[in-house]
Swiss-Prot record:
Homooligomer, may form homodimer. Interacts with p6-gag region of the Pr55 Gag precursor protein through a (Leu-X-X)4 motif near the C-terminus of the P6gag protein. Interacts with host UNG. May interact with host RAD23A/HHR23A. Interacts with host VPRBP/DCAF1, leading to hijack the CUL4A-RBX1-DDB1-DCAF1/VPRBP complex, mediating ubiquitination of host proteins such as TERT and ZGPAT and arrest of the cell cycle in G2 phase. It comes from the Viruses. It comes from Human immunodeficiency virus type 1 group M subtype B (isolate JRCSF) (HIV-1). It is found in: Virion; Host nucleus; Host extracellular space. The modification Phosphoserine is found at residues 79, 94, 96. This is Protein Vpr. Keywords: Activator, AIDS, Apoptosis, Cell cycle, Host G2/M cell cycle arrest by virus, Host nucleus, Host-virus interaction, Ion channel, Ion transport, Modulation of host cell cycle by virus, Phosphoprotein, Transcription, Transcription regulation, Transport, Viral penetration into host nucleus, Virion, Virus entry into host cell. InterPro entries: RetroV_VpR/X (IPR000012). The lineage of its organism: Viruses, Riboviria, Pararnavirae, Artverviricota, Revtraviricetes. The gene is vpr.
């Protein structure tokens, strides 16, 4: 019978260390795109809801990822990612 190979894969960081690094990167990016008061309020909400737990860390990561994704998708003026809004010609000549 075949056996699973022993731990031959790349060494992985502990989950909590990786999670905290991800949160720090998301916070740094969010500060560039959203008002600090919004982010502070979000942090307060998460703390009041989850306390100082890993569930709170995971929740704020998920929310920040969603906010940033939508922000970029709608069209952030700091980024080339997003929907480009085409301006219509006033005389309607752009369509035939």
């Amino acid at each position: 019978m075949e056996q699973a190979p022993e731990d031959q894969g790349p060494q992985r960081e502990p989950y909590n260390e990786w999670t905290l690094e991800l949160l720090e990167e998301l916070k740094n990016e969010a500060v560039r795109h959203f008002p600090r008061i919004w982010l502070h309020s979000l942090g307060q909400y998460i703390y009041e809801t989850y306390g100082d737990t890993w569930a709170g860390v995971e929740a704020i990561i998920r929310i920040l990822q969603q906010l940033l994704f939508i922000h970029f998708r709608i069209g952030c003026r700091h980024s080339r990612i997003g929907i480009t809004r085409q301006r219509r010609a006033r005389n309607g000549a752009s369509r035939s």
